Curated annotation (Swiss-Prot):
Reactions mediated catalytically: (1S,2R)-1-C-(indol-3-yl)glycerol 3-phosphate + L-serine = D-glyceraldehyde 3-phosphate + L-tryptophan + H2O
Gene: trpB
Molecular-function annotations in GO: tryptophan synthase activity
Entry's family note: Belongs to the TrpB family.
Pathway recorded for this protein: Amino-acid biosynthesis; L-tryptophan biosynthesis; L-tryptophan from chorismate: step 5/5
EC number of the protein: 4.2.1.20
Organism: Klebsiella aerogenes (Enterobacter aerogenes)
Protein role: The beta subunit is responsible for the synthesis of L-tryptophan from indole and L-serine.
Full protein name: Tryptophan synthase beta chain
Superkingdom classification of source: Bacteria
Keywords per UniProt: Amino-acid biosynthesis, Aromatic amino acid biosynthesis, Lyase, Pyridoxal phosphate, Tryptophan biosynthesis
Amino acid sequence: RGDKDIFTVHDILKARGEI
């Protein structure tokens, strides 16, 4: 389904410093 996708997006946002 899309659990890993959500984690990937969260990781990207964290790397960008948005979260």
